[in-house]
Amino acid sequence: MEQNDKIQLFEDKRIRTAWDEEKEEWYFSIVDVCEVLSGTDNPRRYWSDLKRKLKSEGAVELYEKIVQLKMTAPDGKKRLTDVADTEQLLRIIQSIPSPKAEPFKLWLAQVGRERIEETIDPELTIDRALETYLKKGYTREWINQRLQAI
Protein backbone atom coordinates (compact mmCIF):
# COMPACT_ATOMS: atom_id res chain seq x y z
CA MET A 1 0.00 0.00 0.00
CA GLU A 2 1.45 3.34 -1.01
CA GLN A 3 0.79 5.98 1.60
CA ASN A 4 1.54 9.61 2.23
CA ASP A 5 2.03 10.50 5.89
CA LYS A 6 0.65 13.77 7.14
CA ILE A 7 0.11 15.37 10.50
CA GLN A 8 -3.30 16.88 11.26
CA LEU A 9 -3.87 19.18 14.20
CA PHE A 10 -6.87 19.07 16.49
CA GLU A 11 -6.88 21.51 19.41
CA ASP A 12 -3.11 21.94 18.90
CA LYS A 13 -2.54 18.20 19.29
CA ARG A 14 -1.07 16.15 16.47
CA ILE A 15 -2.98 13.34 14.84
CA ARG A 16 -0.93 11.23 12.48
CA THR A 17 -2.70 10.40 9.23
CA ALA A 18 -1.87 8.51 6.07
CA TRP A 19 -3.46 8.75 2.63
CA ASP A 20 -3.77 5.48 0.72
CA GLU A 21 -3.51 6.37 -2.98
CA GLU A 22 -4.79 2.99 -4.12
CA LYS A 23 -7.92 2.95 -1.94
CA GLU A 24 -8.28 6.75 -1.99
CA GLU A 25 -8.84 6.72 1.74
CA TRP A 26 -7.45 8.46 4.81
CA TYR A 27 -6.20 6.47 7.79
CA PHE A 28 -5.89 7.99 11.25
CA SER A 29 -3.73 6.96 14.20
CA ILE A 30 -6.21 5.65 16.74
CA VAL A 31 -3.84 6.25 19.66
CA ASP A 32 -3.55 9.92 18.69
CA VAL A 33 -7.33 10.33 18.47
CA CYS A 34 -7.80 8.61 21.84
CA GLU A 35 -5.24 10.95 23.39
CA VAL A 36 -6.91 14.08 22.03
CA LEU A 37 -10.50 13.12 22.82
CA SER A 38 -10.00 11.40 26.18
CA GLY A 39 -7.29 13.66 27.58
CA THR A 40 -5.49 10.60 28.93
CA ASP A 41 -1.80 10.64 29.82
CA ASN A 42 -1.45 7.06 28.57
CA PRO A 43 -3.21 6.85 25.17
CA ARG A 44 -1.75 3.41 24.32
CA ARG A 45 -3.26 1.94 27.47
CA TYR A 46 -6.54 3.79 26.84
CA TRP A 47 -6.76 2.32 23.32
CA SER A 48 -5.88 -1.15 24.62
CA ASP A 49 -8.69 -0.96 27.20
CA LEU A 50 -11.12 0.46 24.62
CA LYS A 51 -10.26 -2.34 22.18
CA ARG A 52 -11.04 -4.91 24.85
CA LYS A 53 -14.33 -3.14 25.64
CA LEU A 54 -15.34 -2.98 21.96
CA LYS A 55 -14.55 -6.65 21.51
CA SER A 56 -16.58 -7.63 24.60
CA GLU A 57 -19.52 -5.54 23.32
CA GLY A 58 -19.54 -7.48 20.07
CA ALA A 59 -17.82 -4.94 17.82
CA VAL A 60 -15.70 -7.74 16.38
CA GLU A 61 -16.12 -6.52 12.79
CA LEU A 62 -14.71 -3.11 13.71
CA TYR A 63 -11.85 -4.71 15.61
CA GLU A 64 -11.00 -6.97 12.65
CA LYS A 65 -10.90 -4.06 10.16
CA ILE A 66 -8.23 -2.14 12.07
CA VAL A 67 -4.86 -2.33 10.36
CA GLN A 68 -1.38 -1.26 11.32
CA LEU A 69 0.77 1.16 9.35
CA LYS A 70 4.26 2.45 9.99
CA MET A 71 3.94 6.03 11.13
CA THR A 72 6.52 8.45 12.45
CA ALA A 73 6.60 8.37 16.26
CA PRO A 74 7.46 11.43 18.39
CA ASP A 75 11.08 10.22 18.53
CA GLY A 76 11.27 10.34 14.72
CA LYS A 77 11.33 6.57 14.20
CA LYS A 78 8.76 4.74 12.07
CA ARG A 79 6.68 2.35 14.14
CA LEU A 80 3.62 0.22 13.46
CA THR A 81 0.50 1.79 14.92
CA ASP A 82 -3.18 0.89 14.79
CA VAL A 83 -5.02 3.00 12.24
CA ALA A 84 -8.66 3.35 11.23
CA ASP A 85 -10.35 4.68 8.13
CA THR A 86 -12.98 7.40 8.49
CA GLU A 87 -15.92 5.05 9.05
CA GLN A 88 -14.07 3.00 11.67
CA LEU A 89 -12.79 6.13 13.37
CA LEU A 90 -16.29 7.57 13.71
CA ARG A 91 -17.42 4.30 15.30
CA ILE A 92 -14.50 4.41 17.76
CA ILE A 93 -15.25 8.04 18.65
CA GLN A 94 -18.79 6.99 19.61
CA SER A 95 -17.25 4.69 22.24
CA ILE A 96 -15.09 7.35 23.90
CA PRO A 97 -16.88 8.69 27.01
CA SER A 98 -15.50 12.22 27.08
CA PRO A 99 -16.85 15.76 26.82
CA LYS A 100 -14.36 16.37 23.99
CA ALA A 101 -16.00 13.59 21.97
CA GLU A 102 -19.51 15.03 22.41
CA PRO A 103 -19.35 17.48 19.45
CA PHE A 104 -18.46 14.56 17.16
CA LYS A 105 -21.28 12.44 18.60
CA LEU A 106 -23.80 15.26 18.14
CA TRP A 107 -22.62 15.76 14.56
CA LEU A 108 -22.93 12.01 13.87
CA ALA A 109 -26.47 12.04 15.26
CA GLN A 110 -27.36 15.02 13.05
CA VAL A 111 -25.89 13.42 9.93
CA GLY A 112 -27.68 10.16 10.73
CA ARG A 113 -31.00 11.96 11.15
CA GLU A 114 -30.50 13.83 7.86
CA ARG A 115 -29.64 10.62 6.04
CA ILE A 116 -32.79 8.92 7.34
CA GLU A 117 -34.86 11.95 6.27
CA GLU A 118 -33.28 11.77 2.79
CA THR A 119 -34.20 8.10 2.53
CA ILE A 120 -37.82 8.96 3.32
CA ASP A 121 -37.86 12.03 1.04
CA PRO A 122 -35.13 11.86 -1.68
CA GLU A 123 -35.88 15.45 -2.73
CA LEU A 124 -34.15 16.58 0.47
CA THR A 125 -30.89 15.19 -0.95
CA ILE A 126 -31.16 17.54 -3.92
CA ASP A 127 -32.01 20.51 -1.68
CA ARG A 128 -29.01 19.80 0.58
CA ALA A 129 -26.69 19.36 -2.41
CA LEU A 130 -27.86 22.70 -3.82
CA GLU A 131 -27.28 24.41 -0.48
CA THR A 132 -23.80 22.87 -0.12
CA TYR A 133 -22.72 23.88 -3.63
CA LEU A 134 -23.93 27.45 -3.03
CA LYS A 135 -21.96 27.63 0.23
CA LYS A 136 -18.88 26.45 -1.65
CA GLY A 137 -19.29 29.33 -4.09
CA TYR A 138 -20.45 27.51 -7.21
CA THR A 139 -22.70 29.41 -9.62
CA ARG A 140 -26.36 28.46 -9.99
CA GLU A 141 -25.70 27.65 -13.65
CA TRP A 142 -22.91 25.21 -12.74
CA ILE A 143 -25.08 23.66 -10.01
CA ASN A 144 -28.04 23.19 -12.37
CA GLN A 145 -25.81 21.48 -14.95
CA ARG A 146 -24.36 19.26 -12.25
CA LEU A 147 -27.77 18.30 -10.84
CA GLN A 148 -29.18 17.59 -14.32
CA ALA A 149 -26.29 15.20 -14.95
CA ILE A 150 -27.33 13.08 -11.96
Whereabouts are the PLM-identified features?
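An anion-engaging/catalytic patch
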Residues: 1-150
